[in-house]
């Protein structure tokens, strides 16, 4: 049975289609009246109804032919990645190849050159490579029996004539050939242009211009793509240019680490892909750390280790030792029979050639990001291990210069040691210097205002570095060292980036996965090593690096594994062994809701390559056994229409059938609607249609082996996922749902390793929620429009009873009571008296009161449970004065960036990961293991409380924000909300506090008041993290040190936080809707906020009175609660969703009675 109809959802004709057809991967019944067992493409061709699916059907046929052709040429079928590339070529898409070493990039390009009809141009960096490719092409052509004219360009007269006459099918040349012969090349039309090495190609800007002219772009279009400070109109025009059908496909075979010059942007702006290489930060490395007495002992131990490990090692000294020490170390090794080379002995190109030949045991360098042995060495078959003679370090002189990068780095290093206003000043200085990191000291004279500010920053730091107390603070800190050298003082901290890059040379990405490596760090200064570990955890949260001792490692077994991987790498580089591993490498599309989440996930595994597909942005990054492609749907793609049936639901027959269409958004106002014409009347700017996002998702789904839909883990996320599942199913049958409750590498990996089917019960519950909101809301809203003559008024099944609570509470707040605030021995107490006159009398006689303490008892104080959506919204409102709407936006950002678990939850449950991987390490480190007291709090189930995803302190997140590692729209409040969550969670996993409580008794002849207070803490616990009580100061004499009388409401009006608590308590709304309900009441001007309290307006009262008087059944709290309970039952599969819709359908009668329903 179909759950919904989707207008413009048919993949073939763009017409209306039912969900049950899409689930089977079929087009609509108009295109294909009867479901068929044969291929859909063949059936549509037979019926002559093939339309929008034609490019995909044609590609399928071409791919089938190409697979046979490839197998004939190479002796094996193309593997997954090569099939993806082939599909892109046949779909006329240009792209840069993202792939590990040894997956047959050049082989693919050559076979595709032979397969395609039309001319092919292949550009290589050198004539030798062009010649080798030409020879290989001839060999492949012979195997498949293809008679194509292959011309390797040389300046010989006969070859030049052959070129000019067009007597060739495939032309191979160098970068210089293109530069010199563009005027002749422009006369030819190419089907494919293949660039083998984009790095060398980009060195000549003119060549890039020539390339884009060969691809059919005009000079004006190239100029627009290179224009700085583009307007929105420019971007719209570029989008139209990108979508224009082109006859020539460009394949860039190897992407570049650092695109040179602005011409690299031509690829993104005109072709929709980056030429920046996707860098994987995945590593398969055993990390070892060994304490030593000094550098001499490190050297002696390393000799022993190197002799055991053998050839293919890299040895690093930190920058603290300098170049002279590098040569000393090299000579030391040579004396001990180790064939050591130094990076100083050769130019970088020569050094690489020596390493590539394997003519060395170890190469010695400096563990700094600019050292040639730290970056750019990609020799998976040669490099086996790395030895660090001391931890990589950042070294800052205490004698400062005006260098912006130096001052920036030093400020960041010392940030946590500054206090109060100076800490804020230091953060501002870091933010300022961030803009000028490329500015050299000698350039500052050209910018007097900048120089003046940099001098101010230098003076700020110098004053601190002259302060003995501050220097003492540095010495006592756990991760910053003050080191003397040659009569000068240096500030030293660990260099995480250099460690990741240098050790990463031992584990490279090849076909079939990461090669195994070993990294050994010797350290004589425990502080320096701790500093490195801390920064690795901070900067590389996804790496989860854990150092072992050498004694814990089975070295013989590890050496064997390392050597097996090197053998595999050699075979792959020689073209052997690929057939065995090719099927292990898959292509996977992951669809999430937001671009932020897409970027976060892609960033877990390296620096992704960006690609535009229609209006979708796709991030591509290699992940072990697969190429990961991540894209975002930007929330819901479909919504209920308004112009069909009963407000979007066909109700002439039973069961009812909701009708959905793509969401259209006004770019200027962000207003959304499913009807283009409706929005056009209200929108001055461009209207964007989610259909364009769907087209992009469909296209990428078609390319890959499998699709995982990873929308949010709740009913709303399930409905978004279901829509994406339906719309993608005709293009890929292998679609699964991946669910994770925190955006972390571990949770993500587990989700894609344990996918599930879409949960139709959750989908049905969300369908019901949307339809009920529409039926009740629209029906009552239409009636209000007629009654009040205001078309912006609205009513809702939750909104209306909640408005009633606000009105009732406000009326109750007009009644006053007495509140006596007094301090006894400076301890604040509050006495509340209902009778105002009596309260005043007590206040007057307070000086006569007898105050005593009695009845001591030992008690255990327990912490509060961790946050749920309602409690965090209440606290953020009360403590930080943030609106519920603002807090939800911040929570969404924190979740998507991977700092907290899913924030729409009513569960207090803490998982084992939360208890033992997040709480325990932090509590043990800060207070001692005896303070750790694991609690599960809530019952089992999928949902968890809101908690941090790792033991990252708020001050560390502040550091990350300042350093630009973490970015938020409102960083200040994001940090405050994170701090609330962090402290409350950590306290929830700490032991109870044991206290002595006593009754404080205040007595008058006519009145007695008692309250139990804590007078002593016998044993601290959670109170050290998140105190929920104050300790009363016991003295011999108890006296009133302050008193104050106030008339206060008997009950206060609701705040946003207390209203949400009331909604939770009374079972109205859900975690995903609490904030929106409050926001709607404010937006409709039914309530206003005054001093944090919600006050009903006259309009709010009138609307509520009208609705409750005329339609009590549909605005009652009881009905709303019953419907919420019914939806929970639908989620659990205990209730038929149609029964609920049938019950509520009665509301349609109201429209007929009021004659308000206008078709």
Curated annotation (Swiss-Prot):
The active site is at 902 (o-(5'-phospho-dna)-tyrosine intermediate). A motif (DEAD box) lies at residues 196-199. Keywords: ATP-binding, Cytoplasm, DNA-binding, Isomerase, Magnesium, Metal-binding, Nucleotide-binding, Topoisomerase, Zinc, Zinc-finger. Residues 587-743 form the Toprim domain. A zinc finger (RG N-terminal-type) spans 1-40. Residues 759-1152 form the Topo IA-type catalytic domain. ATP binds at residues 82, 99-106. Binds 1 zinc ion per subunit. Mg(2+) binds at residues 593, 712. The keyword Zinc-finger applies. This enzyme is the only unique feature of hyperthermophilic bacteria/archaea known and seems to be essential for adaptation to life at high temperatures. It may play a role in stabilization of DNA at high temperatures. This is Reverse gyrase 2. It comes from Aquifex aeolicus (strain VF5).
């Amino acid at each position: 049975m179909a759950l919904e109809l989707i207008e413009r959802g048919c993949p073939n004709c763009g017409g209306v289609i039912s969900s049950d057809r899409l689930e089977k991967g079929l087009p609509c019944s108009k295109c294909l009246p009867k479901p068929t067992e044969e291929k859909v493409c063949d059936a549509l061709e037979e019926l002559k109804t093939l339309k929008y699916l034609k490019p995909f059907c044609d590609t399928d046929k071409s791919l089938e032919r190409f697979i046979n052709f490839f197998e004939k040429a190479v002796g094996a079928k193309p593997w997954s990645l090569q099939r993806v590339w082939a599909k892109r070529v046949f779909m006329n898409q240009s792209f840069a190849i993202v792939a590990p070493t040894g997956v047959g990039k050049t082989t693919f390009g050559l076979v595709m050159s032979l397969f395609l009809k039309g001319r092919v141009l292949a550009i290589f960096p050198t004539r030798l490579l062009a010649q080798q490719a030409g020879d290989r092409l001839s060999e492949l052509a012979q195997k498949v029996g293809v008679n194509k004219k292959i011309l390797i360009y040389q300046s010989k007269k006969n070859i030049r004539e052959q070129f000019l006459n067009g007597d060739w099918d495939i032309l191979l040349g160098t970068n210089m050939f293109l530069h010199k012969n563009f005027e002749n090349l422009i006369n030819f039309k190419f089907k494919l242009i293949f660039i083998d090495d984009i790095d060398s190609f980009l060195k000549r800007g003119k060549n890039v211009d020539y390339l884009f002219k060969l691809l059919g772009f005009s000079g004006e279009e190239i100029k627009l793509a290179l224009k700085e400070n583009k307007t929105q109109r420019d971007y719209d025009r570029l989008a139209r240019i990108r979508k224009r059908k082109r006859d020539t496909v460009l394949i860039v075979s190897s992407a570049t680490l650092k695109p040179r010059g602005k011409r690299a942007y031509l690829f993104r702006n005109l072709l929709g892909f980056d030429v920046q290489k996707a860098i994987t930060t995945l590593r398969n490395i055993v990390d070892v750390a060994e304490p030593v007495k000094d550098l001499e002992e490190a050297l002696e131990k390393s000799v022993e280790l190197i002799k055991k490990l053998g050839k293919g090692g890299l040895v690093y000294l930190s920058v603290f030792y300098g170049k002279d020490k590098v040569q000393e170390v090299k000579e030391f090794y040579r004396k001990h029979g180790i064939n050591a080379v130094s990076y100083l002995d050769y130019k970088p190109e020569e050094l690489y050639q020596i390493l590539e030949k394997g003519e060395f045991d170890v190469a010695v360098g400096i563990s700094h990001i600019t050292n040639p042995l730290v970056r750019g060495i990609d020799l998976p078959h040669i490099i086996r291990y790395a030895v660090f003679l001391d931890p990589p370090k950042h070294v800052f002189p205490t004698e400062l210069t005006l260098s912006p990068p130096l001052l920036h780095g030093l400020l960041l290093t010392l940030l946590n040691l500054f206090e109060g206003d100076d800490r804020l000043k230091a953060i501002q200085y870091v933010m300022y210097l961030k803009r000028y990191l490329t500015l050299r000291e000698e350039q500052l004279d050209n910018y007097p205002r900048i120089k003046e500010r940099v001098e101010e920053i230098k003076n700020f730091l110098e004053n601190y570095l002259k302060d003995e107390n501050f220097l003492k603070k540095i010495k006592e800190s756990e991760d910053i060292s003050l080191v003397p050298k040659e009569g000068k003082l240096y500030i030293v901290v660990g260099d995480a980036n250099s460690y990741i890059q240098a050790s990463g040379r031992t584990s490279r990405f090849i076909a079939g996965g990461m090669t195994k490596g070993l990294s050994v760090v010797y350290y004589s200064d425990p502080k320096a090593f701790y500093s490195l570990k801390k920064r690795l955890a901070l900067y590389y949260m996804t790496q989860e690096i854990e150092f072992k001792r050498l004694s814990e490692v089975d070295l013989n077994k590890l050496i064997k594994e390392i050597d097996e991987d090197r053998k595999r790498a050699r075979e792959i580089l020689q073209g052997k062994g690929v057939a065995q591993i090719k099927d292990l490498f898959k292509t996977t599309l992951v669809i999430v809701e937001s671009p932020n989440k897409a970027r976060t996930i892609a960033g877990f595994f390296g620096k992704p390559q960006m690609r535009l597909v229609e209006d979708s942005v796709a991030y591509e990054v290699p992940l072990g056994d697969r190429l990961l492609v991540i894209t975002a749907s930007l929330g819901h793609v479909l919504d209920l229409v308004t112009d069909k049936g009963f407000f979007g639901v066909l109700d002439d027959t039973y069961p009812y059938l909701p009708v959905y269409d793509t969401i259209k958004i006004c770019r200027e106002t962000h207003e959304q609607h499913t009807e283009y014409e409706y929005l056009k009347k209200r929108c001055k700017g461009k209207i964007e249609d989610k259909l364009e996002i769907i087209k992009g998702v469909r296209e990428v789904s078609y390319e890959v082996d499998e699709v995982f839909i990873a929308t949010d883990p709740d009913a709303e996320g399930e409905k978004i996922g279901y829509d994406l599942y339906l719309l993608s199913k005709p293009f890929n049958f292998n679609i699964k749902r991946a669910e994770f409750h925190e955006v972390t590498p571990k949770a993500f990996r587990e989700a894609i390793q344990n996918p599930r089917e879409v949960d139709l019960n959750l989908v049905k519950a969300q369908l019901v929620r949307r339809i009920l909101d529409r039926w009740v809301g629209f029906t009552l809203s239409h009636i209000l429009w007629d009654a009040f003559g205001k078309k912006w008024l609205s009513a809702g099944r939750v909104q209306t009873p909640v408005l009633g609570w606000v009105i009732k509470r406000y009326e109750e707040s007009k009644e006053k009571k007495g509140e006596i605030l007094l301090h006894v021995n400076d301890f604040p107490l509050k006495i509340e008296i209902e009778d105002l006159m009596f309260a005043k009398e007590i206040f007057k006689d307070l000086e006569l009161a007898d105050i005593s303490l009695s009845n001591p008892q030992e008690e255990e104080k327990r912490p509060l449970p961790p946050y749920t959506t309602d409690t965090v919204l209440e606290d953020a409102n009360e403590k930080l004065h943030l609106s519920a709407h603002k807090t939800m936006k911040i929570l969404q950002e924190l979740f998507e960036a991977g700092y907290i678990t899913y924030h729409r939850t009513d569960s207090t449950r803490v998982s084992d990961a939360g208890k033992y991987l997040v709480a325990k390490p932090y509590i043990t480190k800060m207070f001692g293991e005896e303070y750790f007291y694991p609690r599960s709090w809530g019952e089992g189930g999928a949902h968890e409380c809101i908690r941090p995803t790792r033991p990252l302190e708020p001050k560390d997140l502040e550091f990350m924000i300042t350093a630009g590692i973490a970015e938020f729209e409102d960083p200040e409040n994001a940090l405050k909300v994170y701090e609330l969550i962090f402290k409350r969670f950590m306290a929830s996993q700490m032991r109870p506090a044991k206290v002595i409580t006593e009754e404080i008794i205040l007595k008058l002849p006519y009145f007695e008041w008692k309250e139990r207070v804590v007078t002593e803490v016998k044993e601290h616990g959670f109170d050290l993290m998140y105190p929920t009580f104050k300790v009363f100061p016991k003295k011999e004499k108890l006296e009133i040190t302050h008193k104050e009388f106030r008339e206060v409401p008997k009950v206060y009006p609701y705040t946003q936080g207390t209203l949400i608590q009331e909604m939770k308590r009374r079972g109205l709304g859900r975690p995903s809707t609490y904030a929106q309900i409050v926001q709607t009441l404010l937006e409709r001007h039914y309530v206003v906020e005054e001093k944090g309290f919600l006050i009903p307006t006259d309009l709010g009262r009138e609307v509520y009175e009208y609705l409750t008087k005329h339609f009590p059944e549909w605005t009652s709290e009881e009905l709303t609660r019953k419907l919420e309970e019914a939806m929970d039952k639908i989620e659990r599969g205990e209730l038929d969703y149609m029964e609920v819709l049938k019950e509520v359908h009665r509301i349609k009668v109201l429209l007929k009675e009021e004659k308000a329903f206008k078709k």
